[in-house]
From Swiss-Prot:
Main location: cytoplasm
InterPro entries membership: SAM-dependent_MTases_sf, Thiopur_S-MeTfrase_Se/Te_detox, Thiopurine_S-MeTrfase, TPMT
Gene name, Swiss-Prot/TrEMBL: tpm
Protein name: Thiopurine S-methyltransferase
Gene Ontology molecular function, alphabetical: thiopurine S-methyltransferase activity
Species the sequence originates in: Xanthomonas axonopodis pv. citri (strain 306)
Gene Ontology terms: biological process: methylation; response to metal ion
Amino acid sequence: MDTNFWLERWQLGHTGFHQQEVLPLLQKHWHALDLPKESRVLVPLCGKTLDMHWLASQGHRVLGVELSPLAVTQFFDEAGLQPQRHTSAAGEHFIAGPIEIICGDAFALDASVLADCTAVYDRAALVALPAELRQRYLQTVYVQLPTHCRGLLITLEYPQAEKAGPPFSVDATHVHALFDAAWQVDQLERRDILDQEPRFRDEGVTGLSTAVYRLQRR
């Protein structure tokens, strides 16, 4: 899997992973992080998720990172926003009100870009990556987040042998293996969602759950 894979998905409109509404699990559990309203929230591999609008509505500043220029322009166009733009080493920045999206490679982020992010919302990034890329992703993104940063991580769990990702299965054992050295990890919820995801059942998946974790940087 490389950058062209995701760029092509957006160009061809193969974006079944995009949700047409704010994720209810975000609305249910976000306040468990107990963040000040002015906190800056990182949303890696953000696509054009409506969750960013909801986070902004909570008084937060939002920093999305997205590889696809098409996803970024669609996000602002569909909201009727005309972002200001400038370029840095991280990529092209699109800014409208409290929302900023960097169109660039999340694996090339510099620590200075993340220095004032006091929270991270990861619904679509970790599960989008195959196992061999996850440690690199943590080293590129999570390791560079400031001490005491908090996060909400949402994963999927299913028998990986029954379906090729993405999205990939990331179970609790793997979450703890990735994060425990530097983060306190607390599972807030785990629920069966196979009945709500017919495309997984249609592909032969026999069990599907989603899990929500609260993260606290040590």
